[in-house]
């Protein structure tokens, strides 16, 4: 993926941690993750590609779950090629806020998955998406943002999901 990103002149790719065995200490999975992402980071640095490290839900992983986890892992790897991102679904599931991500990651927060609960179109579920948007803007965020819309309800007509996302943005933002 790093080589493909370089070839396509894509500045960044998203990565996540995977998970450790749930019957082993979390520290073991953490160590494996740090070593693996560190190896990828060294290669990504040489290729001029940034790695956007994403947290996952506790139901998916036992490694990176919160913004504090992300900040700690990024600090331990200590590579300019590794930065953090936030997914609204994972953030809310972990009981965190946008302010937590900005406080813990600072300028290392460089990508946002702006989606409603269950990776749905903003406004299709129950997250306070307008509030989230306003908080992001209040922090002066100028990084990248994407809509990770992957709920099965959109499989039949993905174009409608895009249209609904654009409509939500027009109705709720100045973008």
Positions of the model-derived regions?
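Active-site acidic/histidine proton-transfer and metal-coordination neighborhood
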Residues: 1-83, 93
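Histidine-acidic metal/acid-base catalytic patches
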Residues: 9, 64-86, 91-175
């Amino acid at each position: 993926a790093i080589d493909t990103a370089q070839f396509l002149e894509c500045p960044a790719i998203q990565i996540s941690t995977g998970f450790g065995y749930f019957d082993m200490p979390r520290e073991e999975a953490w160590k494996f993750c740090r070593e693996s992402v560190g190896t990828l980071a060294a290669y990504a640095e040489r290729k001029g590609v940034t790695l956007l490290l994403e947290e996952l839900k506790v139901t998916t992983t036992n490694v990176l779950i919160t913004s504090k986890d992300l900040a700690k892992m990024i600090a331990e790897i200590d590579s300019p090629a590794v930065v953090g991102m936030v997914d609204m679904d994972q953030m809310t599931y972990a009981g965190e806020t946008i302010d937590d991500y900005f406080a813990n990651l600072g300028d290392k927060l460089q990508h946002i998955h702006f989606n409603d609960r269950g990776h749905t179109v903003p406004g299709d579920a129950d997250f306070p998406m307008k509030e989230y948007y306003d908080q992001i803007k209040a922090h002066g965020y100028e990084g990248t943002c994407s809509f990770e819309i992957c709920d099965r309800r959109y499989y039949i007509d993905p174009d409608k999901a895009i249209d609904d996302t654009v409509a939500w943005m027009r109705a709720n933002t100045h973008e």
